[in-house]
Amino acid sequence: MSNYKMPENFLWGSASAAYQVEGAYLEDGKGITNWDKFVRIKGKTFKNTTGDIAVDHYHRFKEDVRLMAEMGLKTYRFSIAWARIIPDGNGEVNEKGLKFYEELIDECLKYNIEPMVTIFHWDLPQALVDEYGGFENRKIVDDFVRYATILFKCFGSKVKYWITLNEQNIFTSLGWLTAMHPPGKFDDVKTFYQVNHHAFIAHAKTVLEFKKLVPNGKMELALLIAQVILLIVIQLMQCQKWILMI
């Protein structure tokens, strides 16, 4: 092992999620997301903090990417906020949203940093939740595929690596089993499986469109596999059940 060297083409990088870093939650036509609403429920986040400003990546992305280059990173995995591209989830496209991500991608390429795009990292347009329940309804499949297709057409020539859904097993379990993420439901096992079913279908149909529009690209579904996380979730569920029994 002492003589082992990483391959020259290994992609050392960093990752972020739109809601966690961008801020600018109402700027340039962006719509409200499920997380924008959820964090305003008292007690749902540490000290009731929000992502309204976060680390202001929306305004400071050029500085952020430059720092990545100085660190020697070769890739940057970031997510696109669905509500920046289609504010109400299934209506008109917001050109200012597309412009922001195009500039971010171009900035990465300027420093020879491979952009890696996550299509969905948990921030769902609230309008889709209000209209039909978001991932609880099969209507989400067509809306997701349309949204993804818009991204492929706009950025497919510049972005090779894509991820459809980030940690599907996490946002579904924390959203419908432990109430720690939107929509904040507890022990709703039936809907939990229903939501996963719709997410898998959305992924599969998106892959089919991806192969047509970005034939030389690579795509995956990102799942989190970590025993320690599972144990924590189980303990939290047991704790909440005990509290509810009291």
Regions found by a protein language model. Name each.
Residues M1-V65, A69-K74, I85-I246:
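Non-catalytic scaffold segments within catalytic domains of secreted glycoside hydrolases
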